[in-house]
């Protein structure tokens, strides 16, 4: 963002955010395209997209300057000369630039707010790297958890109205409304499932911007309740945009609840001295140490709030109440639960000895093996039963390239689940990838797996058998003698880039 600000300066006033002229600047689309290519660590190699031609951008800007497309109705969309022959590609270019432009006032306001009030950070707003240690330290002391599936169905006009509080440029909002109504059905709801694949894949930045603005609006309820009770700890993570939005929400009084009748009178129904809120992408959890009556009141309150504020139906089954001692919580790719760890302590006083049975709560994290195998089967590494198969599409690559692709996926999965309580299930994943790699190489050389391994030796695939302590010793060679004791405890080896794919098992490898 600092690089972009070298080219232009915007007024930092809340009333003068004139973003519309930036849409006609060529360098905006250059920056947007350079930052828009997302790569997946789970993929065999980075994602390389065809860069948009500068000539195409110039022609598109020329059409934008010549046509007053805001006066054209949606019925004339197909005859609109503003769009070129490939209107989807034109929409992709403009949406990338528009998503980058709208983020500018958020960044400027955050920086101005931090400079004026000398605020470095807010201690309860943490990054994705802090979620796992947070769960490990806090969940063993809690009883109930609300497993919330964030409502993502929202009318297009509500999205535009939400952005009005932040983007004061009416022309930019009209352009946003024009895009949404032309690309989607204006009478439908915008949901990740209903949006076409070209919209979700080619316009990820634009789509995430709209979704994050909606999510941060619903999170304002927790900001308000935190002002009422200083013990509400929140952990939220995602794109820079939602972090900026959350900081700004913390610094201004949320008067959203003034219209709710007798809200202050009924606030004590949901006040609780120890609440923990964690969110990642479309899923959030609200954990409490209180009784079941309190957590049920929280559920009823959240359902009523979303239905009233967003004018939409919110099914109560989107929020499930689970007791941590009896149910496993699926979050960030892990199956988490709190189990009792029994221990026997012998106490002796003079000639009398006693055996004291003591049970301690322990935060337990398991690897969801079945969803992982399903993802491997979808990526054609094995069948639905988990039996390894060859990867024919990789048979044309070199031997070292094939081994590197399989090893890359195996290392990422092993590193991500290094904090699991039991890693035995990971050996099955490594076995599938190892044998799939061997069968792919054997297919390439028109041989069998046994003959191929016998000829080249099993050392060819030794990286699949490398244990986690070996990886740590290679990463930190000077302290390798101390890793055996450390390895017995959890080691959260996280990658902020690949976590999006590993936290969602349905993603492609």
UniProtKB/Swiss-Prot annotation:
Does Signal appear among the keywords? no
Tell me the protein family, please: Belongs to the intron maturase 2 family. MatK subfamily.
Compartments (UniProt record): Plastid, Chloroplast
What does the record give as the organism's lineage? Eukaryota, Viridiplantae, Streptophyta, Embryophyta, Tracheophyta
Show the GO MF annotations: RNA binding
| Name of this chain's protein | Maturase K
An individual GO BP term = RNA splicing
The record's section on InterPro entries has: Domain_X, Maturase_MatK, Maturase_MatK_N
Pfam family example for this protein? MatK_N
What does it do?
A: Usually encoded in the trnK tRNA gene intron. Probably assists in splicing its own and other chloroplast group II introns.
Going by the UniProt record, its keywords in alphabetical order are: Chloroplast, mRNA processing, Plastid, RNA-binding, tRNA processing
Name the gene for this chain: matK
Does the keyword Aminoacyl-tRNA synthetase belong to this entry? no
Q: Name one GO cellular component term.
A: chloroplast
